[in-house]
């Protein structure tokens, strides 16, 4: 521990050299060392940073011990020198070995990975043997023996397209999302490595500043010590700057009276030497350590000797670090954008394929629609021709029986309208989704991709339109089918009624021939009533089927997603209008045809009612005839009995035909009437049969058309499901795209914050390097010469030693000039820990934040965060493990207050080409807009609304008509800011003294031109209060109104 002490005048030069070496070593240690391998996270994504606590041994000063050293009074190689020895009492420090806990970052395998190179993951348990990657060493500590051997790892190369080639550690089966997440993790690790480098550089500079402060204090104590020792000079001893001279032991025994003074002085010298010895030993150890590190760095670099100055070296080092950071950031951004591009292309390819599939299906639907349309037109023409034929026939049907059919037709029209509305809603929702996909993000340039997506969306819209046409034609065919079925059913029912009526008439004829008995005629109403009941039953059954079809259609419409409604895009309005026109024309045609059918059925019902009334009247006539015949027969029998009883009056027999003649005449008349009635009924039956044949066929076809409509509704269900799947797929793609964009924005914001923090740190680094250089120059300038001092004359009083200038103040405590006559103080205690201050507030570089807590927070050691149990590392010392968070950075001054909008370009300019207002005055409506950036000026109201708080330049030029004037006011939020009068300012009292007949001065055009402060939402306009403002009927502007946003309000800067 003890070494011979060198002469004191040479010590300060040694300190200066040691400080220079310390500064160089600290700067070299701040960044990644050239001899060490690169950090694994820069090339491999399976390494994770853990915060660990380790116990390290260190030598701690524990007091000092004194010893007596014999010294010669003369220097080396000085021949004429007395041989008397001088004994000096010196002090040396005493050190003991202690242990302390330090916290550092250590790279270990991430959870789920294992192996020597952390390449064995959950998907690939067996890996071939590859070189073990190098484990990063702490930039402020040496590598321990338990770290694995260092091997170089192959770097990733970039392809010509700028994308990173996958390394052997990346699973080729991973999808684009996993690759993006891993690349983002690589960027975060790179930023963390740069942050760690800057923090190490700050800690090194802080240590250099602290050592420089201690060295300055030691230098001051050393220069103060010769003054203390020179107060008691001895005639045969050499005065030194830090020791107390003494004579041989015999001399001490002879001077008992001066021992107390010597002991007190020895105590003072002991304290001083103790402090100096401690500092020298500490500085010596640090210098040796830095010299060894410098030697290693020089051997690893194997480059020529640096001939640059210190500032140029610092500048080159910082520039290299900033360039490396820029290259890494740009490379990461290129990779991220390439991954996003590949992902978007993959998703768009899948979407295109799906749209192509639906397009092929829609083409088949279009062909089917064409066929259905052709058949529908043919059926409509046939139905129109059939319905026009029986228009001149007599009415034979009851109009009350056809009310249900009209109601059903109206219901079918409502259903068609509902289906069309549902189709429009689906198309509108699809258009909204496509419009949202077409609108690009302002921060990302995907013009080519959006154009391609727009083209594919147009194809999808066209297919949707064709699908609408398909639905229209299908419904049209279903309606025609139902109408045909209804006609067929009516024909069948009328045929059955004709058959029954024929049988009734035949029975009536038979009964009339058999003495015209009434039972046959009485049975006609019953038969007719049963036929009507069957017709009503059939119509009710048809109504029920139509109601079922309506319920199915309503369920299909309600089953569609509620968010599909929306307005059709402008480019599809024409197609939609055409579709609606076709639907309306179809509805009108069907409604007209159904009305004609209804009229025909009513005529048939009227004919049936008339026939029923005729039959009833015939039945009454037959009954009356039967009564007359019975009366006639009774009278005949009575007359014959009376003439028989008389016997002698035979002449009365000739008179018997007289009562029989009316009977014969009545029978013949009744027979003629019956013949006419029969012929009329037969003719009417033929007419009714001809009229109702088409209706019967159409009614019979309604049931088949209803079933066809049910099938169409089932097809609509499948189409609705396909549209729902398309919507879900589009929503997934859009949400994934927005997630990627948000992740990119977050990464860019974090990188921006990191770059700003690095810039601040570099600026502070420059300032502190400049301070250190200044301090070193001051130390070198004010150090005493290296020559050996000669003993001062005993008669002269000791001079006060030259002291260096005080160092600049430090945050740990202000440096004060010490008085040489005061007792030396003990070494200062290390400064207490306090929360970090913002950079620039003090002169010291300190970390502005601590590492964030790892996963699972636990506190141990000195209160640092401890992670959850991770994978066991190679070290033997237990410590907290977990993912390390990024340290904090100084908060940059806010550019704008929270919540204040970011100002953008705002300007407008408008002119007047028409009459500004209907009355004589008011707000001028500058109708012709030339520029309106930000859409801040409303030409319909003539008001400019300020979007932000700030300064605005407002300009207005008003031109009156010839031989007229204009008086106007510039209004801001209904408050007058400036006035204008083209005739000039006038005082009110002059108006009373103006001579009569004086000319009115009109003047020329007037203008407002001023800078005003506006708040967000303030309204600015020009109000004319008098005069006439010039305007023309042509596109010529004589009055203008302009404004521009200059800069935001100063409180937001």
From Swiss-Prot:
<feature type="glycosylation site" description="N-linked (GlcNAc...) asparagine">
    <location>
        <position position="458"/>
    </location>
</feature>
<feature type="signal peptide">
    <location>
        <begin position="1"/>
        <end position="30"/>
    </location>
</feature>
<dbReference type="InterPro" id="IPR001073">
    <property type="entry name" value="C1q_dom"/>
</dbReference>
<feature type="glycosylation site" description="N-linked (GlcNAc...) asparagine">
    <location>
        <position position="275"/>
    </location>
</feature>
<dbReference type="InterPro" id="IPR008983">
    <property type="entry name" value="Tumour_necrosis_fac-like_dom"/>
</dbReference>
<dbReference type="Pfam" id="PF07546">
    <property type="entry name" value="EMI"/>
</dbReference>
<dbReference type="GO" id="GO:0008217">
    <property type="term" value="P:regulation of blood pressure"/>
</dbReference>
<feature type="disulfide bond">
    <location>
        <begin position="48"/>
        <end position="110"/>
    </location>
</feature>
<dbReference type="GO" id="GO:0043065">
    <property type="term" value="P:positive regulation of apoptotic process"/>
</dbReference>
<dbReference type="GO" id="GO:0030336">
    <property type="term" value="P:negative regulation of cell migration"/>
</dbReference>
<keyword id="KW-0964">Secreted</keyword>
<comment type="subunit">
    <text>Homotrimer associated through a moderately stable interaction of the C-terminal globular C1q domains, allowing the nucleation of the triple helix and then a further quaternary assembly to higher-order polymers via intermolecular disulfide bonds. Interacts with EMILIN1.</text>
</comment>
<dbReference type="GO" id="GO:1900426">
    <property type="term" value="P:positive regulation of defense response to bacterium"/>
</dbReference>
<feature type="domain" description="EMI">
    <location>
        <begin position="44"/>
        <end position="120"/>
    </location>
</feature>
<feature type="coiled-coil region">
    <location>
        <begin position="253"/>
        <end position="340"/>
    </location>
</feature>
<dbReference type="GO" id="GO:0005576">
    <property type="term" value="C:extracellular region"/>
</dbReference>
<feature type="glycosylation site" description="N-linked (GlcNAc...) asparagine">
    <location>
        <position position="745"/>
    </location>
</feature>
<feature type="coiled-coil region">
    <location>
        <begin position="177"/>
        <end position="215"/>
    </location>
</feature>
<dbReference type="GO" id="GO:1990971">
    <property type="term" value="C:EMILIN complex"/>
</dbReference>
<dbReference type="InterPro" id="IPR011489">
    <property type="entry name" value="EMI_domain"/>
</dbReference>
<keyword id="KW-0272">Extracellular matrix</keyword>
<feature type="disulfide bond">
    <location>
        <begin position="74"/>
        <end position="81"/>
    </location>
</feature>
<dbReference type="GO" id="GO:0005581">
    <property type="term" value="C:collagen trimer"/>
</dbReference>
<dbReference type="GO" id="GO:0033627">
    <property type="term" value="P:cell adhesion mediated by integrin"/>
</dbReference>
<feature type="region of interest" description="Disordered">
    <location>
        <begin position="783"/>
        <end position="901"/>
    </location>
</feature>
<keyword id="KW-0175">Coiled coil</keyword>
<keyword id="KW-0732">Signal</keyword>
<keyword id="KW-0325">Glycoprotein</keyword>
<dbReference type="GO" id="GO:0030194">
    <property type="term" value="P:positive regulation of blood coagulation"/>
</dbReference>
<dbReference type="GO" id="GO:0062023">
    <property type="term" value="C:collagen-containing extracellular matrix"/>
</dbReference>
<keyword id="KW-1015">Disulfide bond</keyword>
<comment type="function">
    <text>May be responsible for anchoring smooth muscle cells to elastic fibers, and may be involved not only in the formation of the elastic fiber, but also in the processes that regulate vessel assembly. Has cell adhesive capacity.</text>
</comment>
<feature type="domain" description="C1q">
    <location>
        <begin position="901"/>
        <end position="1052"/>
    </location>
</feature>
<feature type="glycosylation site" description="N-linked (GlcNAc...) asparagine">
    <location>
        <position position="616"/>
    </location>
</feature>
<feature type="region of interest" description="Disordered">
    <location>
        <begin position="120"/>
        <end position="179"/>
    </location>
</feature>
<feature type="region of interest" description="Disordered">
    <location>
        <begin position="212"/>
        <end position="256"/>
    </location>
</feature>
<dbReference type="GO" id="GO:1901731">
    <property type="term" value="P:positive regulation of platelet aggregation"/>
</dbReference>
<feature type="coiled-coil region">
    <location>
        <begin position="369"/>
        <end position="389"/>
    </location>
</feature>
<dbReference type="GO" id="GO:0030023">
    <property type="term" value="F:extracellular matrix constituent conferring elasticity"/>
</dbReference>
<dbReference type="Pfam" id="PF00386">
    <property type="entry name" value="C1q"/>
</dbReference>
<feature type="disulfide bond">
    <location>
        <begin position="109"/>
        <end position="118"/>
    </location>
</feature>
<feature type="compositionally biased region" description="Pro residues">
    <location>
        <begin position="789"/>
        <end position="812"/>
    </location>
</feature>
């Amino acid at each position: 521990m003890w070494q011979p002490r060198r002469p004191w005048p040479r010590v300060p030069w040694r300190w200066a050299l040691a400080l220079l070496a310390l500064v160089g070593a600290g700067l070299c240690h701040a960044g990644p060392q050239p001899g060490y391998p690169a950090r694994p996270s820069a090339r491999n994504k399976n390494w994770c940073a853990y915060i660990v606590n380790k116990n390290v041994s260190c030598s701690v000063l524990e007091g000092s011990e004194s010893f007596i050293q014999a010294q010669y009074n003369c220097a080396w190689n000085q021949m004429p020198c007395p041989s008397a020895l001088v004994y000096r009492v010196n002090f040396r420090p005493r050190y003991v070995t202690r242990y302390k806990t330090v916290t550092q970052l250590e790279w270990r395998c991430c959870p789920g990975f294992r192996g020597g190179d952390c390449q064995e993951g959950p998907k690939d348990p067996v890996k071939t043997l590859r070189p073990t990657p190098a484990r990063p060493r702490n930039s402020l500590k040496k590598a321990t023996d338990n770290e694995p051997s260092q091997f170089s790892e192959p770097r990733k190369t970039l392809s010509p397209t700028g994308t990173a080639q996958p390394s052997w550690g990346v699973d080729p089966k991973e999808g684009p999302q996993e690759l993006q997440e891993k690349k983002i993790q690589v960027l975060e690790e790179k930023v963390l490595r740069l942050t760690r480098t800057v923090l190490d550089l700050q800690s090194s500079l802080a240590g250099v500043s602290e050592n420089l402060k201690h060295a300055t204090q030691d230098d001051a104590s050393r220069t103060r010590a010769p003054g203390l020792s020179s107060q008691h000079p001895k005639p045969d001893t050499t005065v030194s700057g830090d020791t107390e001279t003494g004579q041989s032991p015999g001399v001490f025994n002879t001077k008992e009276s001066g021992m107390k003074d010597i002991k007190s002085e020895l105590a003072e010298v002991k304290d001083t030497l103790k402090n100096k010895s401690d500092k020298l030993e500490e500085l010596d150890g640090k210098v040796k350590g830095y010299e060894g590190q410098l030697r290693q760095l020089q051997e690893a670099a194997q480059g020529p000797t640096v001939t640059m100055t210190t500032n140029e070296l610092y500048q080159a080092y910082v520039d290299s670090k900033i360039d490396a950071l820029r290259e890494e950031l740009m490379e990461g951004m290129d990779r991220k954008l390439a991954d996003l591009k590949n992902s978007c292309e993959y998703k768009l390819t899948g979407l295109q394929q799906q749209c192509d599939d639906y397009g092929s299906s829609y083409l088949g639907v279009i062909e089917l629609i064409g066929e259905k349309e052709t058949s529908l037109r043919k059926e409509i023409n046939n139905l129109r021709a059939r319905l026009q034929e029986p228009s001149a026939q007599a009415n034979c049907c009851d109009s009350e029986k056809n009310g249900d059919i009209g109601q059903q037709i109206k219901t079918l029209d409502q259903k068609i309208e509902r289906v069309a509305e549902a189709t429009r809603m689906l198309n509108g929702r699809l258009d909204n989704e496509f419009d949202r996909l077409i609108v690009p993000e302002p921060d990302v340039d995907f013009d080519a991709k959006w154009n391609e997506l727009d083209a594919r969306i147009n194809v999808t819209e066209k297919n949707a339109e064709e699908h609408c046409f398909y639905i229209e034609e299908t419904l049209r065919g279903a309606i025609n089918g139902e109408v045909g079925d209804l006609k067929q059913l009516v024909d069948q029912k009328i045929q059955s009624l004709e058959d029954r009526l024929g049988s009734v008439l035949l029975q009536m004829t038979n009964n009339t021939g058999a003495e015209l008995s009434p039972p046959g005629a009485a049975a006609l109403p019953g038969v007719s009533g049963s036929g009507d009941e069957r017709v009503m039953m059939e119509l009710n059954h048809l109504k029920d089927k139509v109601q079922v079809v309506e319920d199915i259609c309503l369920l299909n419409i309600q089953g569609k997603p509620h968010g599909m409604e929306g307005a059709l895009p402008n480019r599809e309005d024409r197609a939609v209008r055409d579709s609606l026109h076709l639907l309306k024309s179809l509805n009108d045609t069907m409604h007209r045809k159904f009305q004609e059918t209804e009229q025909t059925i009513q005529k048939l019902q009227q004919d049936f009612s008339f026939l029923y009334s005729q039959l009833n009247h015939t039945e009454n006539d037959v009954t009356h005839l039967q009564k007359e015949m019975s009366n006639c027969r009774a009278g005949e029998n009575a007359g014959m009995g009376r003439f028989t009883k008389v016997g002698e009056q035979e002449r009365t027999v000739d008179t018997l035909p007289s009562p029989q003649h009316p009977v014969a005449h009545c029978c013949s008349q009744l027979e003629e009437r019956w013949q006419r009635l029969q012929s009329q009924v037969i003719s009417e039956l033929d007419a009714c049969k001809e009229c109702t044949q088409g209706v019967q066929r159409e009614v019979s076809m309604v049931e088949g058309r209803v079933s066809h409509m049910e099938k169409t509704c089932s097809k609509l269900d499948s189409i609705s499901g396909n549209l729902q799947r398309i919507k879900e797929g589009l929503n997934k793609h859009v949400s994934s795209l927005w997630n990627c964009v948000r992740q990119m924005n977050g990464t860019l914001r974090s990188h921006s914050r990191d770059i700003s923090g690095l810039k601040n740190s570099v600026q502070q680094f420059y300032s502190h390097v400049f301070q250190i250089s200044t301090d070193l120059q001051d130390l070198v300038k004010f150090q005493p010469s290296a020559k050996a001092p000669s003993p001062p004359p005993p008669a002269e009083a000791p001079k006060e030693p030259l002291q260096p200038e005080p160092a600049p103040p430090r945050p740990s405590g202000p440096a004060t000039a010490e008085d040489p006559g005061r007792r030396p103080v003990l070494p200062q205690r290390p400064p207490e820990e306090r929360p970090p201050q913002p950079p620039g507030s003090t002169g010291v570089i300190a970390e502005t934040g601590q590492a964030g807590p790892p996963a699972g927070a636990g506190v141990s050691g000195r209160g640092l965060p401890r992670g959850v149990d991770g994978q066991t590392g190679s070290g033997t010392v237990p410590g907290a493990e977990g993912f390390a968070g990024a340290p904090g950075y100084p908060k940059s001054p806010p550019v704008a207050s929270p919540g204040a909008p970011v100002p953008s370009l705002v300007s407008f300019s408008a002119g007047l080409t028409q009459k500004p207002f209907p009355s004589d005055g008011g707000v001028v409506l500058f109708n012709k807009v030339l520029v309106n950036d930000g859409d801040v000026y409303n030409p319909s109201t003539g008001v400019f609304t300020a979007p932000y708080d700030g300064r605005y330049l407002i300009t207005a030029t008003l031109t009156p008509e010839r031989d007229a004037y204009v008086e106007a006011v510039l209004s801001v939020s209904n408050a007058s800011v400036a006035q204008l009068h083209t005739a000039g300012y006038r005082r009110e009292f002059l108006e009373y003294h103006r001579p009569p007949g004086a000319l009115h001065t009109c003047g020329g055009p007037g203008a407002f031109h001023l800078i005003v402060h506006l708040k967000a939402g303030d309204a600015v306009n020009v109000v004319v209060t008098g005069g006439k403002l010039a305007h023309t009927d042509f596109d010529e502007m004589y009055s203008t109104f302009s404004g521009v946003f200059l800069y935001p309000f100063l409180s937001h800067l």
